[in-house]
């Protein structure tokens, strides 16, 4: 029996449309603000407002899923995101856009928690790695296609908002034709995010999500700046970023399958070691294409494997809370990593980007090497 059931395929189809909209807005909002001559610090504050919304949305969604179920939570999340999109057209200004980007951030985080939790509840410990790999592939493909759309269509604010909003609403349609059952309904016990973060046997997965946030946040946010400082043109920067993201897409399925077959611990160790090797290779300034490719293939696949590690340590009724904890950990890493790394790069050297990535990866590798035991019969099962 295929793990890609009808509900899973419809869920991923909706996610693809929503990810297209997310990618387009995340690219164009800073450009629209710059066009309105807002100072750089205000553009940064609007971006921070979006990520703050991500944190709030992550914390809220577990309660909504418990009360409304997966389908209605997904509809609500999409409508919140659509409202955050439409609101941008009401008034252009710093405070207005801070508010609407916060709303959009809440909606996006709700979408991610609902989709990830639904996939984890749909799978078992034996196939969850492949389900999460498919999720990440769809996410990165949607991001890539969103960037392609931006380069091919008019980027005027009032031209973009109608069709982006239509994409968001279209993302609701697939789930109207299926129902994703929440297996938490049998349990009335509420599981807190804090208890999941403190769960000793899942700590390596939580730490992995933090490290993944630091690595991906730094690569996404600071790699273009690094390449620019190396004298690479804007068009070539786009090419190298495409190499990085493409490697992440290509690596998802085989690494997810390997994690299901050989265990998360072994695969995580190899991934982290490869991230360190890729970072060192980038510091040598030779063979940038293979160095970026292996860095992308290993770095962009850390998150789903670390998630699968933690989720096999908890019972079925704790999966949603665990997913919230993992997404929260990733978000914190993606906020703190680029900020700290950017300060180091500004005051010392651009090479600190890869030194930082290699350093945090090495610390995580030591954690993984200390834990020689991997539970062969996980708690979570169907």
UniProtKB/Swiss-Prot annotation:
It comes from the Bacteria. It is a multi-pass membrane protein. Disulfide bonds: none annotated. GO terms for molecular function: transmembrane transporter activity. Keywords: Cell inner membrane, Cell membrane, Membrane, Transmembrane, Transmembrane helix, Transport. Signal peptide: none annotated. The keyword Iron-sulfur does not apply. The keyword Transit peptide does not apply. It holds the Pfam family MFS_1. PROSITE patterns: MFS (PS50850). Its main location: membrane. It is found in: Cell inner membrane. The chain crosses the membrane at residues 14-34, 45-65, 79-99, 102-122, 131-151, 157-177, 204-224, 236-256, 265-285, 289-309, 325-345, 349-369. GO terms for cellular component: plasma membrane. Belongs to the major facilitator superfamily. YcaD (TC 2.A.1.26) family. This is Uncharacterized MFS-type transporter YcaD.
């Amino acid at each position: 029996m295929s793990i890609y059931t009808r509900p899973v395929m419809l869920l991923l189809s909706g996610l693809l449309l929503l990810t297209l909209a997310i990618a387009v807005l995340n690219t164009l909002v800073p450009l629209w603000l710059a066009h309105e001559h807002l100072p750089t610090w205000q553009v940064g504050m609007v971006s921070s407002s979006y990520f703050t919304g991500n944190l709030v949305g992550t914390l809220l969604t577990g309660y909504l899923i418990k009360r409304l179920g997966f389908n209605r939570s997904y509809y609500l999340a999409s409508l919140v995101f659509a409202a955050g999109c439409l609101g941008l057209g009401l008034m252009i200004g710093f405070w207005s856009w801070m508010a609407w980007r916060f709303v959009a951030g809440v909606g996006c985080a709700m979408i991610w928690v609902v989709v990830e939790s639904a996939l984890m509840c749909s799978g078992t410990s034996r196939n969850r790695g492949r389900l999460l790999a498919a999720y990440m592939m769809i996410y990165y493909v949607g991001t890539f296609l969103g960037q392609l759309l931006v380069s091919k269509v008019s980027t005027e604010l009032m031209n973009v908002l109608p069709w982006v909003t239509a994409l968001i609403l279209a993302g609701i349609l697939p789930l109207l034709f299926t129902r994703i059952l929440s297996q938490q309904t049998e349990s009335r016990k509420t599981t807190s995010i804090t208890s999941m973060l403190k769960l000793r046997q899942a700590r390596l997965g939580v730490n992995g999500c933090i490290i993944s946030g630091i690595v991906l946040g730094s690569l996404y946010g600071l790699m273009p700046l690094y390449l620019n400082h190396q004298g690479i043109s804007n068009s070539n920067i786009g090419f190298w970023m495409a190499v990085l993201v493409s490697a992440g897409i290509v690596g998802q399925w085989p690494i997810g399958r390997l994690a299901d077959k050989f265990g998360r611990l072994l695969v995580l160790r190899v991934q982290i070691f490869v991230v360190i090797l890729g970072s060192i290779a980038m510091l040598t300034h030779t063979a940038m294409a293979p160095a970026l490719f292996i860095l992308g293939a290993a770095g962009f696949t850390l998150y789903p494997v670390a998630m699968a590690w933690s989720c096999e340590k908890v019972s079925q009724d704790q999966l949603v809370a665990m997913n919230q904890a993992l997404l929260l950990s990733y978000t914190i890493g993606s906020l703190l990593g680029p900020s700290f790394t950017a300060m180091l790069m500004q005051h010392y050297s651009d090479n600190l980007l890869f030194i930082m990535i290699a350093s945090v990866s090495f610390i995580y590798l030591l954690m993984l090497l200390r834990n020689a035991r991997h539970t062969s019969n996980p708690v979570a099962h169907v």
